[in-house]
A protein has these predicted regions:
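Aromatic-lined carbohydrate-recognition surfaces of secreted/lumenal glycan-active proteins
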Residues: 16-38, 84-95, 129-141
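A short, acidic, amphipathic alpha-helical segment used as a generic capping/interface helix at domain edges
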Residues: 72, 76, 114-119
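Surface-exposed amphipathic alpha-helices with a cationic face
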Residues: 9, 13-25, 75-82, 121, ...
Length: 179
């Protein structure tokens, strides 16, 4: 992504992909937001065994009711551009807290995360799209020192490993009853 402080030029990524492919038996890919695959990453695609995209509707100011449709557009846009390559979603998720930095605080909570998770997994299973949900656990060390920094709150579990609303039905034995 363009905002990173350690951006690697595409021609250098191509060199790395070629180097890895010489020594690996596994398929090789490169994980990135969906947008660069429409432009600057086009030369890289020929070197990849499959394409890996990230999609975060909430970072792009999408309401939960538009989120899955937006995710589909991101996926289909890349898949249609490169019909010869399999495409998977290697990061997709919904934050549960925000201080307003990049994400409207009214557009994040555990209920909305649960809706997006179920919509996303239902669609990807129906379509046979390999999808990885970002992320397993909140990472309280990420982002700024502000406790509500959205980078800290993408997990399906809190940083203390207790399940958020979306995971509670699957991990009831981890949730203490409120007295």
């Amino acid at each position: 992504v363009e905002w990173t402080d350690h951006l690697v030029p595409v021609d250098r990524v191509i060199e790395y992909v070629r180097m890895v492919k010489k020594g690996a038996r596994q398929p090789v890919t490169f994980c990135e937001n969906y947008v660069p695959y429409h432009t600057k990453l086009a030369p890289l695609v020929a070197e990849l065994d499959f394409i890996s995209i990230h999609t975060y509707p909430v970072w792009e100011y999408k309401h939960i009711h538009d989120a899955l449709e937006y995710t589909k557009e991101n996926y289909v846009g890349v898949a249609n551009k490169y019909p010869e390559k399999p495409v998977m979603i290697t990061e997709a998720g919904w934050a549960t807290n925000s201080n307003g930095r990049g994400i409207d605080p009214d557009n994040v909570n555990e209920v909305l995360q649960e809706i997006y998770y179920h919509d996303l997994t239902r669609w990807s299973e129906e379509e046979g799209i390999i999808t990885f949900v970002f992320e397993a656990f909140d990472e309280k060390w990420k982002g700024s020192s502000d406790e509500l920094e959205p980078e800290k709150h993408w997990g399906l579990f809190k940083s203390d490993r207790t399940p958020k609303k979306v995971m509670r039905p699957y991990f009831r034995h981890l949730v203490k009853e409120k007295v």
